[in-house]
C-alpha cells in the first residue's frame, strides 16, 4: 500500500514514518504534525506517476502496454480488495474483453458472454449506491450521468432477454470505455492541480506561524526520499516504472490536450453552424416567400462565406468534431420548428403506422427507399454549406458516420428519418452521370437531374461504403446496399452483389421485399422467396416470350375462336416491348461508339422507361391465379381464402384463429368404411404369390400356403389368412 497526498508523488520509507506517527498521534519533528486528512489517504498505487502511466496505457493502441496496465490494476485490486474504485474495475473488465476480442482465440458466444458480463456489471455498479434505499428506474439514473437509454436497454437484453448480437456488445463496450475515459480518467488528471492547491490552503489554515518551514520540510521529505528496494523483483518493477514515468507524463499531456482540443473545436463548430442558420433564416424572413429565399440562398452572403471559411479551418484541424456538430439535433437533423418555418410537413416514411392502418412492428419493411429523399427546401437550405465543404474525404466520412448511427436509432422518429434521407441523398448526389445513374428510380433520377446538391460528384470509395453498410446492419441495410451497388456500378460482379444482398436480408430478417429484382413484379401471394409461388414467378420471366405462342397453340387445339382473338390482342401488346428492347440494344451500341452523347441518350431512356405497359399487371395476374386455384379445389372441402393474412406471423402448421384443440381441423361431415368393404380392384383378383417383407417375415396371401423351401430360410411368425382377416375387420377408413 502507498501513501498518496493529493496530486503529489508517493512517500518513501521515511515518509511512511510520518504516516504512522500521524496515525498514532505522534510527531517526528518537534513541530506539531498534520492530521491524517491533511496528508491524504492510503491508496493502492505507488505514486501519481504510476496512476498517470496506467491511464495512458489503458487507452493506447499498443496491446502490450494495455496488458501491462491491466496487470498493474490486478496488483491494485490485490492490495485494496473491495476498495478499488468502481470506474477502475469496470474499465479493466472492458479493456480485457476488448483485448480478447482483438487477439482472437475465442468464439462469438464466449465473447458475447464476456462483453455482456462486463456491461451488466458496469450498469449495476454505477446505479447500486442509489438503488439500495429507493427504487429508482435505471434510465433515470443513467440520464443523470449522460448515459443513453440504449445502454440500459442493452443491459436489460443481456440480463432478461435473448443475447444481443456481438456487434451490439462491441458497440456498447466502446461507448462505455469512451464515457469512462471522458467522465473519470480525464477528470482525475484535470483535478490534480486543484487538489494540490486545496491541500496547501488547508496547511496554511492550521499552521500560520510556521508555514514556510513546514512547507520546506514536507517538500524535502517528498522529493529527496526514495523507496528502499526489498528484493530483486520489486527493484526491477520500480525501474520499469521509473523509466516510463517521463514517457507516461508526456503521453497524458498530449492525450488531455487532444481531448480538450476536440471539445473546443466541437463548440466552435456548433457556433458557426448556428450563425449559418441565423443568416439563412434572416434571408427567409426578409423575402417572406420561400422560392425567392431559395434564389437568395444560391448567392451566399459575405457572412455565409466567412462562416464557410472558418468551418473549413476547423475541419482541417479536427474533422470528427465538425461531423459531431453536423449530426446534432437542429442542424442536418431538423427540429419541428425548423420544418414548419420551411413549410415542410413531417413524415417519417411509415404512413401505415401513423394513419393507424396497421400496428405490426415490422411495418418499416414496407418503406421503399427509392422514394426517400430529403425535402428539397431543406436540402437547399444547407446546400451552400455542404457544397463548400464537399470533398472526397469529408463526404465519405459523413456518409460512414451516418451509416454507423443508424443501428443505434429507432425505427420511427425525426432523427432516424432524416439521417436515412441524407444518406440516400448523398449517395445519389455523388453518382456520376452515366450507366450507374440509369439504375436509380425515377424519383431519384429526377432529383439527380433536376438540381445538383454539389457542383461535381466526388469519387467515393464505394467498396469501403459497402463495408460500412455491412458493418452497421439495421432494417434499412438491404435497400441501402442495393442503392450503393447501383452507384458503384460494376465494382462487384452481379452474383457477388446478389449473395451480399441475400446474406444481409437474412441477417436483418427483412427478406420479404428486399430481394425483389428491379423491374420485376413481386409475388402477389406472400412476398417470401421460399414458396412455390415465388418459384413460379422466378421462372416466368425466362419463359414469358414463349408463353403467348404456347397459349395460342393450346387454344387452337381446343377450337375456341374467342380465346384466339384475345390472344392476338395480347400479342399486339407484347410487340411494342420487343421493339423497345431492340431500340435499347441499338442505343447501347451507339453509346459505346460515341460516348459524348451518352448522357442525353440515358436521360431519354430514363424518361421513357416508366411508361412501358407491355407486361401484364399484377392485379390481373393475381386474379387469374386465384381463379385457377379455386377451380382446382372445386368440390372439395378446402377453399382459397380471400382474406389478407400475414402468414409470416404464424408458426408452420398453424392457421389464423386456431386453438390448441387437435380436433379443430377435422371435417364436420365425413363417411367411414371398413377395409373389407372397399371396392375390389383387378390387381387383387390376380393370383397371389408368396411375398417376403423387409423384416424377413413370409406370409401367405390367397391360399395361405407357402413353399417349405422359401419359408425354411427365414425365422419368425407365419401369418395365416384367418389372422389377416381378423386384422382387416377392425380397420376403418374415412
UniProtKB/Swiss-Prot annotation:
Subcellular location as annotated: Nucleus, Nucleolus; Nucleus, Nucleoplasm; Cytoplasm
Function: Required for the synthesis of the 60S ribosomal subunit and maturation of the 28S rRNA. Functions as a component of the Five Friends of Methylated CHTOP (5FMC) complex; the 5FMC complex is recruited to ZNF148 by methylated CHTOP, leading to desumoylation of ZNF148 and subsequent transactivation of ZNF148 target genes. Required for the efficient pre-rRNA processing at both ends of internal transcribed spacer 2 (ITS2).
Involvement in disease: Intellectual developmental disorder, X-linked, syndromic, Wilson-Turner type: A neurologic disorder characterized by severe intellectual disability, dysmorphic facial features, hypogonadism, short stature, and truncal obesity. Affected females have a milder phenotype than affected males.
Source species, domain of life: Eukaryota
PTM annotation (Phosphoserine): residues: 441, 523, 560, 617
Protein's name in the database: Ribosomal biogenesis protein LAS1L
Ranges of biased composition (kind: Polar residues): 547-561
GO biological process, one term: rRNA processing
Covalent link location (Glycyl lysine isopeptide (Lys-Gly) (interchain with G-Cter in SUMO2)): 215, 226
Enzyme Commission number, as recorded: 3.1.-.-
Interaction with NOL9, as annotated region: 636-655
Gene Ontology molecular-function annotations: endonuclease activity; RNA binding
Description of how the protein assembles with itself and partners: Component of some MLL1/MLL complex, at least composed of the core components KMT2A/MLL1, ASH2L, HCFC1/HCF1, WDR5 and RBBP5, as well as the facultative components BACC1, CHD8, E2F6, HSP70, INO80C, KANSL1, LAS1L, MAX, MCRS1, MGA, KAT8/MOF, PELP1, PHF20, PRP31, RING2, RUVB1/TIP49A, RUVB2/TIP49B, SENP3, TAF1, TAF4, TAF6, TAF7, TAF9 and TEX10. Component of the 5FMC complex, at least composed of PELP1, LAS1L, TEX10, WDR18 and SENP3; the complex interacts with methylated CHTOP and ZNF148. Interacts with NOL9 to form an ITS2 pre-rRNA endonuclease-kinase complex.
Keywords: Cytoplasm, Disease variant, Hydrolase, Intellectual disability, Isopeptide bond, Nucleus, Obesity, Phosphoprotein, rRNA processing, Ubl conjugation
Effect noted on mutating residue 170 to C: In a colorectal cancer sample; somatic mutation
GO cellular component terms listed in the entry, alphabetical order: Las1 complex; membrane; MLL1 complex; nucleolus; nucleoplasm; nucleus
Name of the gene: LAS1L
Sequence similarity: Belongs to the LAS1 family.
